UniProtKB/Swiss-Prot annotation:
Gene source species: Oryza sativa subsp. japonica (Rice)
Active-site residue list: 140 (proton acceptor)
Name of the coding gene: CIPK30
PPI: region residues: 358-387
E.C. no: 2.7.11.1
Name of the protein in question: CBL-interacting protein kinase 30
Induction pattern: By drought and salt stresses and abscisic acid (ABA).
């Protein structure tokens, strides 16, 4: 790093800040605790490698992060003090949040009691409302991006994927898919254009659920089920949620962005307006954590006991086909699937073998079933495969030449997982795995081209969060 060294071998940046311990690292930056030499004040310094930023094409993203942080001065948003640069490094000098990540505090408890969860949620909503009033949409809200100061107050951070009003197209919508899968709104998944404010509100709803429950509302091992649950807002509240909290969540996690609750309406709700008391007066651990051991069964029982009118209202909203639209993230500099590919909490290892043993592949697309079948037929014809259209969205391809284990036989199955979104599974049903790998690399992947939204498996991004209702795992 471009740092001066004092006689005591301390690392000093530009004669002004003494660098301390590493707090965290991202793809292109590291964050350190540091001290201002003139005053001894603790700060956090985010250090970017200029060459890596330029090589990755994320220069505009870094500039946007600076612009956003200079716009947003709020007690619940991490403050940017100054920006410095040398030939090889860029330094963001920021407010230091000594309480660490909210995620870390949550991981030490099975869940938060409702008064504690409400306190954090109130602070989050006031911060998000202020950002929106300044034309800033965060687009990656999650517990890992919520820090705590010495008093335990919440601070929103990491505006690297944020958007400004100036990024809207002529239709007044954002079109870059980004964010972290489990927290991303359905309309972002559908990738047609979305209101950044409404997408942030959905993420706030997921965060509130996590604070109250200790696990994610949408967290399935099966990609098809995951997509469907998110787009239909299919989740279950555990029995310890109050009626008012459940009603608020139903409005926050409304799959239709046009009818999803607004921030002003959130603030008007009696549940939100309840006065908070200092954290010192509240237990940070739920009084009956043992209930988590049977949370799935308890949730199912509680669902049966829900108020009929409320349940009907939720079911009606779940069936809405949205008129607006990542994961995500699809790179503006990085987008939904790219971010997903970096998420260690996502795992398709059971479905996809290592590259040398590949016998299956899966991709998502926004093309119609007819277009998908037509393209697969073209691929079969070009590769001298026979082609058979089977029932229930399945097609079969069979090679004309025998390999070491006979002719290569392939089956493709098409699943509709959301409005205008299909997932296609392609698997070897006969022949040799090396022949399938050659087919995948040389014929299938190149021929599909732009028809594919994203590949899952092998050298491409995995998509599925690991484990159903478990305590949340950290997502990058």
């Amino acid at each position: 790093m471009a740092m001066e060294t004092t006689s005591q071998d301390s690392q000093v940046i530009m004669g002004r800040y003494k660098l301390g311990r590493l707090l965290g690292r991202g793809t292109f930056a590291k964050v350190y605790k540091a001290y201002k030499l003139a005053t001894g004040e603790a700060v956090a310094i985010k250090v970017f490698d200029k060459e890596a930023v330029q090589r990755s094409g994320t220069v505009e993203q870094v500039k946007r992060e600076v612009d956003v942080m200079r716009r947003v001065h709020h007690r619940h948003v991490i403050r940017l003090h100054e920006v410095m640069a040398t030939r090889s490094r860029i330094y963001f000098v920021m407010e230091y949040a000594s309480g660490g990540e909210l995620f870390t505090r949550l991981s030490r408890s099975p869940r938060f009691p409702e008064p504690v969860a409400r306190r954090y949620f109130q602070q989050l909503i006031t911060a998000v409302e202020f950002c929106h009033s300044r034309g800033v949409y965060h687009r990656d809200l999650k517990p890992e991006n919520l820090l705590l100061d010495a008093r335990g107050d919440l601070k929103v951070t990491d505006f690297g994927l944020s958007a400004l009003d100036g990024g809207l197209r002529g239709d007044g919508l954002l079109h870059t898919t980004c964010g972290t899968p489990a927290y991303v709104a359905p309309e972002v998944l559908l990738k047609r254009g979305y209101d950044g404010a409404k997408a942030d509100i959905w993420s706030c709803g997921v965060i509130l659920f996590v604070l109250l429950a200790g696990y994610l509302p949408f967290n399935e091992t099966n990609l098809v089920i995951l997509y469907r649950n998110i787009t239909e807002s299919n989740y279950r509240c555990p029995p310890w949620f109050s009626v008012e909290a459940r009603k608020l969540l139903a409005r926050l996690l409304d799959p239709n962005p046009k009818t999803r609750i607004t921030i002003s309406k959130i603030m008007d709700r009696p549940w939100f307006q309840q006065a908070t008391c200092p954290l010192g007066d509240m237990s940070l651990v739920a009084s009956a954590p043992s209930v988590l051991l049977a949370r799935k069964e308890a949730s199912q029982q509680h669902d049966d006991e829900e108020d009929d009118g409320f349940a009907r209202e939720k079911k009606k909203r779940s069936n809405v086909i949205m008129s607006s639209p990542v994961i995500d993230v699809r790179p503006s500099s990085m987008n939904a699937f790219d971010i997903i590919s970096r998420s260690r909490g996502l795992d398709l290892s059971k479905m996809f073998d290592a590259e040398e043993r590949r016998s299956e592949a899966r991709f998502s697309t926004r093309e119609t079933t007819t277009a998908i079948v037509s393209k697969l037929e073209e691929i079969a014809e070009a590769g001298r495969f026979s082609f058979k259209l089977k029932e229930k969205g399945r097609v079969e391809l069979e090679g004309s030449q025998d390999g070491r284990k006979g002719a290569l036989a392939i089956e493709a199955e098409i699943f509709k997982v959301a409005p205008e979104v299909h997932v296609v599974e392609v698997r070897k049903t006969g022949g040799d795995s090396p022949d399938f790998r050659d087919f995948y690399k040389q014929e299938l992947k190149p021929s599909l081209g732009d028809m594919v939204w994203a590949w899952q498996g092998g050298d491409s991004p995995p998509l599925v969060p690991a484990a159903g209702r478990r305590p949340i795992t950290k997502r990058s």
